[in-house]
UniProtKB/Swiss-Prot annotation:
Gene behind the chain: nhaB
This protein's name: Na(+)/H(+) antiporter NhaB
Keyword Cell inner membrane: yes
PANTHER family per the UniProt record, alphabetical: NA(+)_H(+) ANTIPORTER NHAB, TRANSPORTER ARSB-RELATED
InterPro entries given in the database record: Na+/H+_antiporter_NhaB
Function: Na(+)/H(+) antiporter that extrudes sodium in exchange for external protons.
Species of the source: Shigella flexneri
Length: 513
């Protein structure tokens, strides 16, 4: 018997999301206009809380849908205007271009990145050294590329290697369901569990590496570009401004990587089983023998394009998104990717997040129009200039660990800029606050997958169930990094940021605009 019209509509609404989640969103949509009539300020904060809730529940439903419905309603009832949303989007066009073109551009360099991580995995036998190499490689790549893409590449390597060994362990040559362990021989099971532990630790080291590298440059994370634009900094300026905090944090983060592997804490320390290494080495040798001259040329071309990318970013030869577009054109032209559908696949990863970011800007417009953050900013600005830095860092960190850091970074840098333009703080203090906001947004956010887009991407990937990486386990494995990165970042903001920045100015390396 066919279901009723009402039941059909209910099932279609937000698809596979749980019924309680659908009901919660409907309640939000009914309550918001009523509260807005009574108190626009309270309604504005309620909208922000609801939006953060949709981000926290990203595994139940992609936040673009519920967040978009809330944003559309906010414009309809007058919490902000469509014109203001357009202005916010226009002001952040560079960020949208970064997400659209840079992420897609790096997609066409995946073969080179896969080659690099495969060589690392099979060439280095020491687990401590291998973990450090993955962390450093991910950090370096994330300083110039998009963190999501770097994690996507490492996931591709891990899924590929897991699949190779899983087929051997289940004594099957054809493609099988990787989640089906029913055909695994008993003596392979222990080895497979050890291999899962090994891959889990590598993935977490790589994920944290993207955060360590991503905070250092203006293209490492989308919010960095927003902050750099608000402060008027180019690539080199941004790197130097952040370095009093980011360099000590990077060093301590890498030491943490070695420590947890050495002491086998928090689920780290599992080594690559020798049986697995033999299987993977055989497969790699076979692949190398089958690699044609055309394949080798592709790798060389991608490496040259990588050099162009780093050079163009460092010298600020064009807007970041346009440099990404040049990478797409060069990579596709010189590696023979000419089919429209093949090119289109490169954009599937970035466009949903680009659309979500546009919804962020709608909520930012509400925050500005309803002056929601004014009380918090006033509280922070009443403190001494020295204390302001730590307070901004802490407030950013708390919110970033449960919400998306692009959203948080955008809000706080807008408020700080408004305070500077109104004369509440000096330009010099504003530039120091921009560093505190950027580091506070990026570093503590490794605490949960909600804060780091790369972590959320890993958690929702096909790899996570294969290696038994759950939300709780990810939070537990990230804990040592969360503590070290957050505390070292706070100490650097408190004690090294102002004096080192002053010294840079005296040396003539940076200047206040």
């Amino acid at each position: 018997m066919e279901i009723s019209w009402g039941r059909a509509l209910w099932r279609n609404f937000l698809g596979q999301s749980p019924d309680w989640y659908k009901l919660a969103l409907i309640i939000f949509l009914i309550v918001n206009p009523l509260i807005f009539l009574i108190s626009p300020f309270v309604a504005g904060w309620l909208l922000v809380a609801e939006f953060i809730f949709t981000l926290a529940m990203a595994l139940k439903c992609y936040p673009l849908l519920p967040g978009g419905l809330l944003a559309i309603e906010a414009v309809f009832i007058g919490m902000t205007s469509a014109e203001h949303v357009r202005e916010e989007v226009a002001a952040n066009l560079e960020v949208l271009l970064l997400l659209m073109f840079m992420v897609a551009g790096i997609y066409f360099m995946k073969q080179l990145l896969l080659f690099i991580f495969t060589r690392l995995l099979l060439s280095i036998r020491s687990k401590m050294l291998l973990s450090l190499s993955f962390c450093v490689a991910a950090a370096f790549l994330s300083a110039f590329l998009d963190a999501l893409t770097v994690v996507a590449v490492v996931i591709s390597v891990a899924v590929g290697f897991y699949g190779i060994y899983h087929r051997v362990a289940s004594s099957r040559t054809e493609d099988t369901d990787l989640q089906d362990d029913s055909h695994i021989d008993k003596h392979y099971n222990v080895v497979l569990e050890q291999f899962r532990g090994f891959l889990r630790s590598l993935m977490m080291h790589a994920g944290v590496g993207t955060a360590l590298g991503g905070v250092m440059t203006m293209v490492g994370e989308p919010q960095n570009l927003i902050i750099a634009k608000a402060a008027g900094w180019h690539f080199g300026d941004f790197f130097l401004r952040m370095s009093p905090v980011t360099v000590p944090v990077l060093i301590c983060g890498l030491l943490t990587c070695l420590l947890v592997e050495k002491l086998r804490w928090f689920g780290y320390g599992e080594t690559l089983p020798e049986k697995v290494r033999e299987v993977l080495q055989q497969f790699d040798d076979q692949s190398r023998h089958q690699r044609t001259r055309q394949d080798k040329i592709r790798l060389i071309v991608q490496a040259i394009i990588g050099v162009w990318l780093v050079t163009a970013l460092a010298l600020h030869l064009a807007e970041v998104g346009l440099i990404g577009l040049s990478v797409i054109i060069l990579a596709t032209s010189l590696t023979g990717v000419t089919d429209e559908h093949a090119i289109g696949k490169a954009f599937t990863e970035s466009l949903p997040f680009t659309a979500l970011l546009t919804v962020f800007f709608s909520v930012v417009a509400v925050i500005i129009d309803q002056q929601l953050f004014s009380p918090i900013i006033q509280f922070v600005l009443q403190a001494s200039e020295h204390a302001q830095l730590s307070l901004f860092y802490i407030f950013n960190g708390l919110l970033s660990s449960i919400s998306d850091n692009v959203f948080v970074g955008t809000i706080y840098i807008n408020e700080a800029k408004a305070a500077m333009e109104s004369g509440a703080i000096t330009l010099k203090q504003y530039e120091l606050l921009a560093v505190a906001i950027n580091t506070g947004t990026n570093l503590p956010s490794v605490a949960t997958p909600n804060g780091q887009a790369a972590f959320l991407f890993l958690l929702t990937s096909a790899l996570a169930p294969l290696i038994r990486l759950s939300y709780g386990r990810m939070v537990w494995m990230a804990l040592p990094y969360t503590l070290v990165l957050t505390l070292v970042g706070l100490l650097c903001v408190e004690f090294t940021l102002a004096p080192v920045t002053e010294w840079f100015m005296q040396m003539g390396w940076i200047a206040t605009l």
